[in-house]
Amino acid sequence: MHKVYLKPGKEESLKRFHPWIFSGAISRFDGEPEEGEVVEVYTSKKEFIAEGHFQIGSIAVRVLSFRQEPINHDFWKRKLEIAYDMRCAIGIAINPVNDTYRLVHGEGDNLPGLVIDIYAKTAVMQAHSAGMHVDRMVIAEALSEVMGDKIENIYYKSETTLPFKADLFPENGFLKGGSNDNIAQEYGLKFHVDWLKGQKTGFFVDQRENRSLLERYAKDRSVLNMFCCTGCFSFYAMRGGAKLVHSVDSSAKAIDLTNKNVELNFPGDPRHEAFAEDAFKYLDRMGDQYDLIILDPPAFAKHKDALRNALQGYRKLNAKAFEKIKPGGILFTFSCSQVVTKDNFRTAVFTAAAMSGRSVRILHQLTQPADHPVNIYHPEGEYLKGLVLYVE
């Protein structure tokens, strides 16, 4: 195993159990580790401090353990058992009306670079680091042992998620099984999961609790679901008793999937219509007929150099919603950009509210659900921000 030596003083963040080692903190390497290899990390005084996956780029090492231990099948199995036991403890993995949840959430489960989502009998595994890609087969074997007959398929979906500097060429495909049965259930509602071509692992698991909250506010309201993607906010609103629900997305494919999902749950229901159209153009044209609006756009910024434009985008989008929503309306507004902080997002929304001149009150401050835990030593893991606002 190759060794990495840090510059003097650069071990302090590791002493606080932060799971990332940046390339600028490294003094030298003992040898030439390969991309994705497990390396041992030492202080400038040659004291062991951690071990983890190495890769070329800004984050040079993602820590797997703060003690010396073999990173082998037993290691992965133990980590996956811990993750599964937590999901059972919070009730999400053993809920009879829900078979959709996140089993592994990267740094939140002390497995930086790895995401595993469960959809009924299929686990979708995604690598966000070179090391997790290199170790994918042993991880899949351990996952199969931990989950037993609870899963029949493991699909690997990492063609677009590895860092661009990684000299790797992952291919999507089944590591176990091969079933095309892609219907899963969330709190009694059914939906199609497109793990072959869909975004993320095929579905946005992280909005489950926020969708459930929306259901409580939907009765007798006219609902607009912007950036609808799979349409899940829409059919939660329908179950909640909305009098009409309109779903909007610029992607015709997203609209097709939304219509399929609505039909799966509410066949022939005339309350729902879907439109393939730009969000801003639709709000300008039709926005003043709604008293419940959901703004759940894709990430406006994935890197810090895009932050300024992202905040302008959030201000513009929310300002248009404040301008159009009916008096007494409720606005659910979100940001899933990790580089946009909670304060950044609130400031953008508050500025938009002030521009509208309307009285606005916060009803809820939202975040990601419990199966997307945040490692207390890695606050960067809190990426989903949301507000529920009452607009007079």
Can you say where each PLM-predicted feature lies in the sequence?
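Non-catalytic accessory regions of SAM-dependent methyltransferases
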Residues: M1-I118
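Conserved SAM-binding motif I beta-strand of class I
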Residues: L244-D249
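C-terminal catalytic and target-recognition region of SAM-dependent MTase-like enzymes
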Residues: I330-E392
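Mobile active-site "lid"/loop adjacent to the S-adenosyl-L-methionine
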Residues: Y290-K320
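Non-catalytic substrate-recognition/targeting regions of SAM-dependent transferases
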Residues: V104-D117, H133-F204, S212
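Conserved SAM-binding loop of SAM-dependent methyltransferases across substrates and taxa
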Residues: T230-K243
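Conserved class I S-adenosyl-L-methionine
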Residues: D220-C229
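S-adenosyl-L-methionine
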Residues: K253-I294
